[in-house]
Amino acid sequence: MTRKLITAALPYVNNVPHLGNLIQGLSADVFARFCRMRGYHTCFVCGTDEYGTASETRAAEQGLSPAQLCAHYHALHRDIYQWFDLSFDYFGRTTSDAHTELTQALFRHLDARGFISEHESAQAYCLHCARFLADRYLRGTCPHCRNAEARADQCEHCGVLLEPETLLNARCVSCGTAPEFRPTRHLYLNLPALEKAYRSWFCTTNHLWTKNAVRMTEGWLRTGLQERAITRDLRWGVPVPKAGFEQKVFYVWFDAPVGYISITKCGTEAASSQEGGGTDDGVKEKWQSWWLDQQDVELVQFVGKDNIPFHTLFFPCMLIGSGQRWTMLTRLSATEYLNYEGGKFSKSLGVGVFGSDAKESGIPSDLWRFYLLYHRPEKSDAHFTWHEFQERVNSELIGNLCNLVNRTLTFVARTYGGVVPAQDGARSTRAQVMEETLALREAVRNTAKRMTDLMEQVQLREAFREVFALSARANKALQDGAPWKTRAQDRERADALMRELCYVIRDVLILAHPFLPWYTQQAARFLGVQLSSCAPEGGGAVCAAKKDADTAQPDTVQPTLRWSDVGERKGLTQVHPPVILFRPLETETIAAYRARYAGTARDGAGVSVPRTAQMPTGMNKKETDAQQKKEEREMPPPSDTARLSAFFSERVVLKVARVLQVERHPNADMLFVETLDDGSGVERVIVSGLVPYMAADALRGAHVLIVDNLQPRSLRGVRSCGMLLAAEYVDAQGTKAIELVQAPWALPGERATLASAPPVITPHGSAVIDADAFFSVPIRVVNYAVEVAGEPLMVGGRPLVMQRVKEGTVG
């Protein structure tokens, strides 16, 4: 298809985006620039997701109205994305009138066709504020880690998912009053009624999605779709246009995806206004030309893995259920997580480098783009570290690509007076000169073909690395040819090499332009050409009168190059003396940046958190010190192998259990509820997050290893007694997978012990340990063998051995 409708996941406006949040926008920008350079009619939209409880609560904390807060953060997001050179055709908001109209219209279509139902449920209610409390309006003490500021849906200190009724000392965040639970009625999207039609559509399109998206969506479908609430008792949101529900708003998951449509509509209206005309019908026709009754539009969406089901399942079901012929998802690129210095980014805790930090760091935006795209987490989680940032920038970007440009063009400027040599090696009568020239051209041709295929498949990281492989090949040709030595004796060979390298540089800059728009445009000027990744002439899309740095006009009219110009060998005549565009990152500077933007300490679970967040609100220093001493008594020093072994043998009970039954969690789509025979005579229930990784049938009958004496906890309303042990690996397709630790030869109840200990059957009811104590003893996979403190784990005299995981950590 030659029409590309490209979206990046709508960022939520409750804080500044961090580097991990920027991955989707950067990825979509690279693909949009590539599409424009290929001549595709392209529309690239994004915007801020502004409704919901997070905006309401954050606004209340800052003494602002939700509208004021959203306006502030919308402008902040817009400025950050502009600094990162994201070439949106339009960047909008979900608080527009168009968004409300389209969301309500979509709801009315669903309701009229019988896909909306009503149900009653219990919800926390504040008597003082006289309102129901959504998750973020209710806080209390986490029953697991005793963090006194846990939200009703999740504790950010220990990461455990919670239910409102499990909070200890629950209170309204606005007034501090303890809530009561009252019945309330809500509207639901009847997904079961849409499942047949959805499955039919899913089977025809998912081959163009990333593996993680397919796997996660299949996990939702295995046990059948469930009805999902679409309304909330809030004020800040799209009002529900239905009698009896006028005081409610739509759940943000329902209205946010409609933002892609409403932002496109706002963009076309803005473009029409700037063009000085256009009737209402013309405006409608423009946005409809992208979203309604179009067979030639390919919808390509970029999201993080936490947003997968909203784009692959819920939004498509909404569109299918409306009965209208909407443009449906064609290709989905879902990335894994980008972590920070061994920990996690956190908007609310302020952990990691944020967009505003990058902007203020003095480091050019293309250096950030380079690293984030070079390490794009396509198939597994990636990690940002300052050390590797420095290494990659200095060695690959500056030492490889920039070095090729500067060395080659400086030599031509000085030695040839800035005139590109006329000697075409492909026409030489000398075999050596011809072969060297044709070898470089073949390298360019092969790289361009591989990159084009990879870019069309949205495998951006591998495509980007092809640029540096070609650059390294050209650097080697320059070094081997050594024209500064050979030119006096072999002028023809030196001239042919330098001419060809000038064209190779032009090719490299074209191929790298979607990734590094500022650098490649500036470097292209040294060759007297310019690059373009803006909308094609007359394309329109939803282009406002936008003028990026990469599209700025030079002093004189110059040839504009596109993707199809790679491999062409005409048009270069002059070389301007190059200037240094990037300086290497110095070790001292990087150390200062790391200290400046870290400001973190390690909590007991190994999660990086700000020092100011280490002491949960409500615990004084004496209580915190006492808790720390208790943890120190329970957790052995990790460097003490003997004590690790002793602690494991005395405190940690791992034993075999047979999986009897597997069901989907009634309140959590990504969780299984397993019933197991653990040899005690009483069935055990464990909740696990294995839905995205394996089918229920793969679990049934398995003899798995469980943590027998782990402190029970409630996960979304189901009490979980223990934990299944598993390890991560990357499968043959390069995607993350999970392998369970199993002992098929063993009986239920048989305990796993260190090789030096005798096998035993553990009595039911051993002393419980918490998660921190369990994870303080690393269980590792070393050459397929499961070990603790360097000693093999055994069951029934046989070692535990993984089938797929060669090296890794068990948890």
Curated annotation (Swiss-Prot):
GO terms for molecular function: ATP binding; metal ion binding; methionine-tRNA ligase activity; tRNA binding. Residues 648-753 form the tRNA-binding domain. Residues 606-640 are annotated as: Disordered. It comes from the Bacteria. Binds 1 zinc ion per subunit. A motif ('HIGH' region) lies at residues 11-21. This is Methionine--tRNA ligase. It is found in: Cytoplasm. Belongs to the class-I aminoacyl-tRNA synthetase family. MetG type 1 subfamily. Pfam families: Anticodon_3, tRNA-synt_1g, tRNA_bind. ATP binds at K347. It comes from Treponema pallidum (strain Nichols).
